[in-house]
């Protein structure tokens, strides 16, 4: 493995001003790809930016077993404001720009009032595994896919284990901290014996610049890729450090998720999401540990929290 120490670094403020914008070639000086082999990349400030492992999953039965399941997922989210720009054609809902610099809108309800919930452009992106308390769901829980599609979930778990092994081999200190953190969470909310609680599945979505909110601060993110068909773009850039990765099929990237990062636009040949019909697809799978899951109780106690929440909502509607 080759070590790279970058010689340029921008300010955090300048990187944050790019949030929601998509990456362009002007944003990077160094571009990593499969031809260059494995790379460990440090910033000019001495921090570890990423470790790039091209082809690390090629020929791995766990990768081959998980792909059909993840390809077949029809997860859709409108809670990805950082994915708004460049993906508006996924669904035109009359989005408007909000002061945060992200594309958000509020729907008009049937009674004519405006919803208080902000939404973004719908994209093929979603979460599987487990999730902590948040917003309207103040209880820890399995995602719907993990709870209902148990056989398919079982086909994904070996890939999570394989990626956990690559994390331990390549970022040992961070992997140890993250594994200890996850082991302290009830078993019901861990992805088997891996150092992860959650996976985000992005299907052919070009994320605008963003930091990953909610990931364990002392941990690391792990991303892997499945490419099918012909397309251009999808280069992942860390603009503060002016380095980018053009990842290919079976590649793995270990990265600091708290750095602002984002992708260049995607342009493919043939129907999107349908490589079996001569089209194209770019699956990126991101695994991490959710920091707020340290609060999770055993499932019975979390179900009690969920029931109390349901009763509160029912009472509120009854008095409305």
Segments from the language model and where they lie:
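Fe(II)/2-oxoglutarate oxygenase catalytic core
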Residues: 1-222, 244-245, 270-320
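Conserved short secondary-structure elements within globular domains
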Residues: 198-206, 224, 235, 258-264
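Conserved metal-binding segment of the jelly-roll/cupin
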Residues: 224, 245-260
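Ordered, helix-dominated protein-protein interaction surfaces in large eukaryotic regulatory proteins
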Residues: 226, 238, 252-255, 265, ...
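A short beta-strand-loop-beta hairpin characteristic of the jelly-roll/cupin
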Residues: 226-248
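Short Gly/Pro-enriched loop/turn and capping motifs at secondary-structure junctions
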Residues: 231, 260-262, 291-294
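Composition- and surface-driven signal marking solvent-exposed, interaction-prone regions
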Residues: 234-239, 265-268, 299-301
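Histidine-centered metal-chelating micro-motifs
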Residues: 253, 258-274
């Amino acid at each position: 493995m080759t070590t790279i120490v970058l010689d340029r670094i921008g300010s955090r403020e300048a990187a944050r001003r790019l949030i929601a914008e998509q990456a362009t070639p002007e944003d990077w000086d160094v571009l990593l790809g499969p031809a260059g082999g494995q790379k460990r990349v440090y910033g000019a400030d001495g921090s570890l930016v990423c470790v790039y492992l091209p082809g690390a999953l090629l020929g791995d039965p766990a990768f081959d077993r998980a792909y059909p399941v993840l390809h077949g997922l029809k997860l859709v989210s409108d809670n990805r404001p950082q994915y708004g720009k460049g993906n508006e054609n996924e669904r035109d809902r009359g989005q408007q720009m909000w002061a945060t610099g992200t594309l958000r809108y509020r729907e008009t309800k049937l009674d004519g009032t405006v919803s208080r919930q902000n939404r973004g452009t719908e994209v093929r992106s979603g979460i599987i595994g487990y999730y902590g308390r948040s917003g309207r769901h103040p209880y820890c829980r399995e995602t719907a896919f993990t709870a209902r599609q148990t056989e398919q979930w079982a086909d994904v778990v070996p890939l999570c284990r394989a990626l956990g092994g690559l994390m331990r081999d390549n970022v040992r200190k961070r992997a140890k901290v993250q594994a200890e953190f996850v082991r302290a969470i009830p078993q019901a909310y861990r992805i088997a014996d891996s150092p992860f609680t959650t996976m985000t599945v992005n299907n052919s979505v070009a994320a605008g610049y963003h930091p990953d909110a909610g990931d364990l601060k002392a941990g690391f993110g792990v991303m892997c890729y499945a490419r099918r068909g012909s397309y251009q773009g999808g280069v992942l850039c860390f603009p503060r450090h002016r380095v980018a990765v053009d990842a290919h099929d079976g590649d793995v990237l270990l990265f600091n998720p708290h750095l602002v990062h984002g992708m260049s636009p995607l342009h493919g040949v043939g129907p999107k999401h349908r490589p079996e019909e001569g089209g194209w697809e770019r699956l990126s799978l991101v695994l991490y540990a959710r920091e707020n899951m340290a609060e999770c109780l055993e499932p019975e106690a979390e179900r009690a929290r969920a029931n109390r929440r349901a009763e509160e909502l029912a009472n509120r509607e009854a008095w409305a």
